[in-house]
UniProtKB/Swiss-Prot annotation:
Subunit structure: Homotetramer; dimer of dimers.
Residues involved in pyruvate binding: 44, 202
Catalysed reactions, semicolon-separated: L-aspartate 4-semialdehyde + pyruvate = (2S,4S)-4-hydroxy-2,3,4,5-tetrahydrodipicolinate + H2O + H(+)
Family: Belongs to the DapA family.
Keyword set includes Protein biosynthesis: no
Protein name from the UniProt record: 4-hydroxy-tetrahydrodipicolinate synthase
GO molecular function: 4-hydroxy-tetrahydrodipicolinate synthase activity
Length: 291
């Protein structure tokens, strides 16, 4: 159910509020371009600066606009287990198909603490759960052995792996087999992860080039490895450009340059430096995304 190019969609703002019209248009554009799933309220969606009502509103809009055409995987993670349960239950009530739960950040739990955190959430909620491992942001790395334990739970169905460590991903897939779906959380490793047995990606770059990203995964699934490889190299400069400053600053700036959203962030995130903005524009022009 959860495979291919799933966009870690941005949250557009306008004068400090969620730009609902721009958001709805973005979702429709993604579906038209072939995106396989929408992931609201993740890192790229600036979930950390949304209040509860805004968080729920973003999920609600996504579910309503998608209207069951493709899966909606709502970001519901927290470093408080009780809070994660609360948000996940709300996402379930709003109609999300699954929940994406980042590892608890700042409080740095042990592997046993991580296991108990996710098991508690799975025991007390009713939708499929996808773990999210991004130690570069959370300072905690959920190890393959811990994921293998969690994969025994019927509601824990996947993991977004954003370590960029293919040795760890390989061990993870070897230990878990088909019990869990492994998704790339690092666009640089999308093709490599597929070769190891992964099934898709929760992608930042898909925000600006949904058609090409979806086509990469479609080509792989059809066995057209050479075409998938060509798309990988075509997308590589864009993947790099999306991280010349902290995500989601570059991707939102790119979407603003493309006329899709306003160039607006919430503090402590702010606009790009002019130097990096010029570099970004050059990459977008080379890719044919802006004139």
């Amino acid at each position: 159910m959860f495979k291919g190019s799933m966009v870690a969609i941005v949250t557009p703002f306008k004068k400090g509020k969620i730009d609902e019209k721009a958001f709805e248009k973005l979702i429709e554009w993604h579906i038209k371009e072939g995106t396989h799933g929408i992931v609201p309220c993740g890192t790229t969606g600036e979930a950390s600066t949304l209040d509860y009502e805004e968080h729920y509103k973003v999920i609600e809009i996504t579910v309503k606009v998608v209207n069951k055409r493709i899966p909606v995987i709502a970001g519901t993670g927290s470093n408080s287990t009780d809070e994660a349960i609360m948000i996940t239950k709300k996402a379930e009530k709003l109609g999300a198909d699954a929940a994406l739960l980042v590892t608890p950040y700042y409080n740095k739990p042990t592997q046993e603490g991580l296991y108990r955190h996710y098991k508690e959430i799975a025991d007390k909620t009713g939708i499929p759960l996808i773990l999210y491992n991004v130690p570069g942001r959370t300072s905690v790395n959920i190890l393959p052995q811990t994921v293998a334990r969690l994969a025994e739970h019927p509601r824990i169905v996947g993991i977004k792996e954003a370590t960029g460590d293919m040795k760890q991903v390989s061990e993870l897939i070897r230990l878990c087999g088909d019990k869990i779906t492994v998704l790339s959380g690092d666009d640089f490793t999308n093709l490599t992860l597929l070769a190891l047995g992964g099934k898709g990606a929760i992608s930042v770059t898909a925000n600006i080039c949904p058609k090409d990203m979806a086509e990469l995964f479609n080509a792989w699934e059809k066995g057209d490895i050479e075409h998938a490889r060509k798309l990988h190299y075509k997308l590589e400069p864009l993947n790099k450009a999306m991280f010349i400053e902290t995500n989601p600053i570059p991707v939102k700036t790119a979407l603003a340059m493309m006329g899709k959203i306003k160039e607006e962030f919430r503090l402590p995130l702010c606009e790009m430096s002019q130097t990096n903005k010029e570099k970004l524009a050059e990459v977008l022009r080379s890719a044919g995304l802006i004139k």
